[in-house]
Curated annotation (Swiss-Prot):
Subunit details: The glycine cleavage system is composed of four proteins: P, T, L and H.
GO BP field: glycine decarboxylation via glycine cleavage system
GO molecular function, one term: aminomethyltransferase activity
Record organism: Chlorobium luteolum (strain DSM 273 / BCRC 81028 / 2530)
UniProt xrefs under PANTHER family: AMINOMETHYLTRANSFERASE, AMINOMETHYLTRANSFERASE, MITOCHONDRIAL
Keyword tags: Aminotransferase, Transferase
Stated name of the protein: Aminomethyltransferase
Domain of life: Bacteria
Catalytic activity: N(6)-[(R)-S(8)-aminomethyldihydrolipoyl]-L-lysyl-[protein] + (6S)-5,6,7,8-tetrahydrofolate = N(6)-[(R)-dihydrolipoyl]-L-lysyl-[protein] + (6R)-5,10-methylene-5,6,7,8-tetrahydrofolate + NH4(+)
Pfam families according to UniProt: GCV_T (PF01571), GCV_T_C (PF08669)
Length: 365
């Protein structure tokens, strides 16, 4: 089992540790609800060092990545990050990822932990077609910490006073020095709140983690586990690989049309996307249940005539709304907000309603 550089801290703090994609990761510390609410009201600190990260370098690096992904990377300037998707030729999703453009010949990529090896192999298989393109896997040498919440910038200013975080635009990043090491600070996140994600060499993870927690103590900062990370992203309707998106899902049927630029030229999976665009049959939608039963992945959705119309992608009890909420892959004709649906949970039909995503308003909305 793999461990992040912060694993000893998590263990000492009494975190509940689980196996997540081959990594021993904290799922909770004080409790999922308390941690969730801390991020929504104050700030939370996440160890997300299990995420994979690669460099793509060379004079044809941008051309290569344009071929491999759906978004238009030429629109990103140096110092900007871009949410993106890689597809198989049939339009199924290899992974969703963030690409950071350092300069015209240097790109940094963060991918999902469970897809790290698969993604790297997929990129390697196609890089041979582009002379001079070099791939470097830095996943084992780098740590990634996320600071998220409405008070995140107040805390960050105490630890990194040279960073003018509020002036750092959404999906922009910069590099700066901290205790003699270089940090990459990006205004990105997975919670819907103001915040940053910070990439650094492994040896700097613990000092920075402890400095941020100490600086944030007066503001109510908490360390946050994967459990609250999931409830936070689900309240926003953000995709999680293996749930809303996977190898059998086309991005045009998963609320990701905005990152598929069919007019940019050829990319892997473009032809499949063109076919789906002509007649998309389903998409991902949000729903809320009336009772207390929790929807789980794979539960079936039905209309009032008892016809199956979709399946649950993710579900939880929203700590903000105090209602069972979920996302589902749903036939398009049932996606109008207010539409009545029924979710089969343990053999009983639970009534619910389609609701727009995101479910909640945040410091970014």
């Amino acid at each position: 089992m793999k461990k992040t550089a912060l694993y000893p801290w998590h263990e000492k703090a009494g975190a509940r540790i689980i196996d997540f994609g081959g990594w021993l990761m904290p799922v909770q510390y004080s409790g999922i609800i308390a941690e969730h609410r801390a991020v929504r009201s104050a700030a939370g600190l996440f160890d997300v060092s299990h995420m994979g990260n690669f460099y793509v370098k060379g004079p044809r690096a941008e051309e290569f990545l344009q071929h491999m992904t759906t978004n238009d990377l030429s629109r990103a300037k140096n110092g900007q990050a871009q949410y993106n998707v890689m597809l198989y030729p049939n339009g199924g999703i290899v992974d969703d990822l963030i690409i950071y453009r350092i300069d015209a010949q240097t790109f940094f990529i963060i991918v999902n932990a469970g897809n790290c090896e698969k993604d790297y192999q997929w990129l390697q298989e196609h890089a041979a077609e582009y002379d001079g393109v070099v791939l470097e896997d830095h996943s084992s040498a780098m740590s990634l910490i996320a600071l998220q919440g409405p008070k995140a910038f107040d805390i960050l200013k105490k630890v990194l006073p040279s960073l003018d975080a509020p002036s750092l635009g959404s999906f922009h990043f910069c590099t700066l020095e901290y205790s003699g090491a270089e940090l990459m600070v990006a205004r990105t996140g997975y919670t819907g709140e103001i915040g940053v994600e910070i990439c650094m060499p492994n040896e700097m993870a613990l000092p920075l983690w402890e400095d941020l927690l100490e600086a944030g103590r007066p503001e109510g900062i908490l360390p946050i586990g994967l459990g609250a990370r999931d409830t936070l992203r689900l309240e926003m309707g953000y995709s999680l690989y293996g749930h809303e998106i996977d190898q059998d899902t086309n991005p045009l049927e998963a609320r990701l049309k905005w990152v598929v630029k069919l007019d940019k030229g050829h990319f892997i999976g473009r032809e499949a996307c063109l076919q789906v665009e002509l007649n998309p049959k389903r998409s991902v939608a949000g729903f809320v249940l009336e009772g207390r039963a929790l929807p789980r992945q794979g539960c079936k959705l039905f209309n009032s005539d008892h016809q199956e119309i979709g399946r649950v992608c993710s579900g939880t009890l929203s700590p903000t709304l105090q209602e069972p909420v979920g996302t589902c892959s749903l036939l398009r004709e049932y996606q109008k907000p207010g539409t009545r649906v029924f979710v089969e949970i343990r053999g009983t039909m639970q009534p619910g309603t389609i609701r727009p995503l995101p479910f909640v308003k945040t410091s970014l909305s």
